[in-house]
């Protein structure tokens, strides 16, 4: 693949921040609701957004997929969540964790926090914590809502209710600021989740995307598809000089040369931007994501 074509992948990576901002705006398009202290409840809420974004955010244009999934499995008339499961499979098989890197509002929030100029710490020696998000997915998103039910057979959305910091950031805080009744109803659970939010904020300043790496069940779901998704990262080993700049640049602690489509890769493109030989690029369905007379060039 020539240099002209390689630059397309690099440009996508370079404009990632803008793409994240636009995705966050589209996910929360009803901005006037912040001043009204109300939640948008139109037809858009019947559709899930790809990233982690609280249903209760006043500006939210769609439903959170994790919240929607818990609502189904926790229902007193539980049936297999065909729509939500199909949604996960469709996006996972198509994009994998590209969604985490480019389309998730809470991922962008962590990226912005990490830009605050302070000493940064590596998570290289904390890789074991990666598996925590899978435990949270199975226990708090699936098992608890399904098995721990009330007298009429309804289960709580345990992850949203007891763990998710996005709910406090986007939902509880803005709604309480505009509604005295909500402020008066805030209690110990709000305090507990606020502590989680503050902890994630502090950790995000010091470490790169700790919530994505260790806690997020949505990232856990998308990670299952990273190795088979239509969008992938390709390393041209015949061009590689073994400088390891790509692996050093990866803040998700992925060895790019060995496993470019590792479950932890959020496809941010940092490895592409530092490669001196332009040997790393995006592919879609086995074809280069690049220009060649306005067509996709075959691998």
Predicted regions and their residues:
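Non-ligating segments of multi-cofactor redox enzymes
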Residues: 1-257, 263-299
């Amino acid at each position: 693949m020539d240099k002209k074509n390689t630059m397309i992948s690099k440009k996508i990576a370079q404009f990632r921040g803008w793409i994240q901002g636009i995705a966050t705006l589209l996910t929360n398009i009803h901005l006037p609701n912040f001043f009204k202290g109300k939640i948008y409840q139109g037809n858009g809420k019947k559709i899930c957004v790809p990233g982690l974004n609280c249903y209760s955010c006043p500006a939210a244009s769609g439903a959170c997929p994790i919240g929607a999934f818990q609502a189904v499995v926790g229902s007193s008339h539980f049936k297999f969540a065909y729509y939500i499961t199909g949604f996960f499979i469709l996006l996972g098989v198509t994009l994998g964790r590209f969604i985490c890197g480019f389309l998730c509002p809470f991922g962008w929030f962590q990226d912005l926090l990490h830009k605050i100029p302070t000493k940064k710490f590596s998570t290289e020696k904390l890789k074991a914590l990666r598996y925590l998000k899978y435990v949270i997915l199975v226990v708090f998103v699936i098992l608890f809502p399904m098995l721990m039910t009330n007298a009429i057979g309804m289960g709580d959305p345990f992850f949203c209710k007891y763990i998710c910091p996005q709910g406090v950031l986007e939902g509880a805080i803005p709604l309480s600021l505009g509604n005295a009744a909500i402020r008066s109803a805030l209690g110990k659970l709000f305090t507990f989740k606020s502590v989680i939010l503050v902890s994630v904020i502090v950790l995000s300043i010091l470490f790169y995307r700790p919530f994505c790496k260790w806690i997020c069940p949505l990232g856990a779901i998308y990670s299952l598809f990273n190795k088979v998704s239509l969008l992938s990262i390709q390393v041209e080993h015949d061009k590689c000089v073994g400088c390891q700049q790509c692996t050093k640049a990866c803040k998700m602690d992925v060895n790019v040369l060995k496993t470019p489509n590792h479950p932890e890769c959020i496809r941010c493109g940092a490895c592409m931007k530092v490669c001196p030989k332009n040997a790393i690029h995006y592919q879609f369905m086995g074809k280069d994501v690049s220009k060649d007379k306005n067509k996709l060039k075959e691998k």
